[in-house]
Amino acid sequence: MNSETISAQAPATLTIASRESRLAMWQAEHVRDALRKLYPACDVKILGMTTRGDQILDRTLSKVGGKGLFVKELENALADGRADLAVHSLKDVPMALPDGFALTAIMEREDPRDAFVSNDYASLDALPAGAVVGTSSLRREAMLRARYPHLDVLPLRGNLDTRLAKLDRGDYAAIILAAAGLKRLGLEARIRTLIDVEDSPPAAGQGALGIEIATHRTDVAAWLAPLHDPRTALAVEAERMVSRALGGSCEVPLAAHAVWRAGELYLTGRVSTTDGQRVLTAEECGAVMTVADALALGRAVSDELEAQGALDIVNALLAASQAGKGDA
């Protein structure tokens, strides 16, 4: 289908729902610019929104409702027609979407790795005993506690600029962030070291952008189809299956990372206790041609982790999280 045919079928307007942080708006603008290139006659607008996840900054996500806090308001805008599509960092999207919504396009992935950011130290290995390291995720916290038990790991909330400001004012000796966000905002110079995926497998979907729509909007799905990257989509389908099968959420240090090598998809899954004392890892690979293949690969990795006792870790962490919420 040529661009003239696509443009002729495009709507007069499209509205993108997005969080209002600088990174989220960059992502929405990235999608807007791609849509404008595809459909020059279409007026593409951005509806900026503040989500509960952006408002609650004094507690970790695992204690206040998880990743859904970042998407609920955007889904409401899709449901009531204020927006036609919503753009997300895929790692922030819950593994199971509410009925009536779907991730219809997954864009080509940025760097999925975690980044070490510090003003005074070149790497995690250079940090002295007792140095304070900030992170927003239990997955990264578990990695730090397992590999660097001499460090003091503390929660770090807020958008990307807020986190960097907290580092710059001396609250932390170093912080761990997703490399993709820093690169997208032109802040790659802040990265002192990129952490190898063997040491710190990323969260499912990290580095990828997902576009969500209401499932009845088949017209929007068709317009978004040219933005979809099939290889990235198959990789993140496998990753998200690992997390979904194990009940993964913000309460569980769970990583899932897939990479293409010589035509096959290699998938690694990892589940840890929050103190890093127990770390379970599983790896599988296969020829993945369809979504069903990707889901099967994800299930194979989750089955292997279950055989190692992953559900014992997951259930204990979920029970502890629920008990903590009850005490709040």
Swiss-Prot record:
Keywords: Porphyrin biosynthesis, Transferase. Coiled coil: none annotated. Gene3D superfamilies: Periplasmic binding protein-like II (3.40.190.10), Porphobilinogen deaminase, C-terminal domain (3.30.160.40). One of its GO terms (molecular function) is hydroxymethylbilane synthase activity. The keyword Transport does not apply. The modification S-(dipyrrolylmethanemethyl)cysteine is found at C250. Tetrapolymerization of the monopyrrole PBG into the hydroxymethylbilane pre-uroporphyrinogen in several discrete steps. Monomer. The porphobilinogen subunits are added to the dipyrromethane group. This is Porphobilinogen deaminase.
